[in-house]
Amino acid sequence: MFLFSARLCYNIDVETGYSTSQEEGVTMKQTIITISREFGSGGHFIGEEVSKRLGIPFYDKNIIQQIAEKTGFSEDFVKEQSEYAPSKNMFAYAFVGRDHTGSSLSDQVYAAQTQVIRNLSEKGSCIIIGRCADYNLKDRPDTYHIFVYGDEYEKISRTQQLFNLSEKDARAMNRDMDKKRRLHYEYYTDRKWGDPGNHCMCLNTSALDMERCIRYILDLFE
């Protein structure tokens, strides 16, 4: 085990099954990376940059269209339901909006999302952002689960720049989004969101620069 920034650790089994990467012509094994992240930590940017350098698919909001096609719901509705809890209260989330079978619209979106994520993982190496992908692919031996987090001040600063917000509004946005992500994740997985035990690598973007985080993930493909 290697420790970086108190929470970065590796637990990697090297397997066969190699394919060719577009990055510097290196050889890499087929690998699926899931990235869960705190809002404002830069996890989306890191995942997107890794996918560009390796020339492999990157899935985040582009999953929404596939989920919408499976469920018949609008893309706007799926966007709201696929990663963020509609309520900030676990009790309300568990019981509101269910039909006589006990199923809610959120449950239908989650079921379709799970199927889409598993189908995408069968197509080859890729990066998947959020949406409980770490849980849905937890039994795949060729998959590594990353959690990206950061210090509050730096996350607030990043959110301010991205959305042109005041410090107060950026802080509120970060906390609200993370609370909804946590509730959604913990409701559907029965696991603690951000638990290092569920990830092979935890990256603190306040202690490690973006390039170093990207390089750590690239190493998983070699």
Task: Tell where the protein language model's regions lie, with residue ranges.
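Small-molecule kinase domains that catalyze NTP-dependent phosphoryl transfer to phosphate-bearing small molecules
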Residues: P86-Y93, S166-E211
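Extreme N-terminal starter segment of soluble prokaryotic enzymes
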Residues: K29-I32
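Short, Lys/Arg-enriched N-terminal segments with co-localized hydrophobic residues
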Residues: M1-T27
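ATP-dependent small-molecule kinase phosphotransfer cores
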Residues: A68-S125
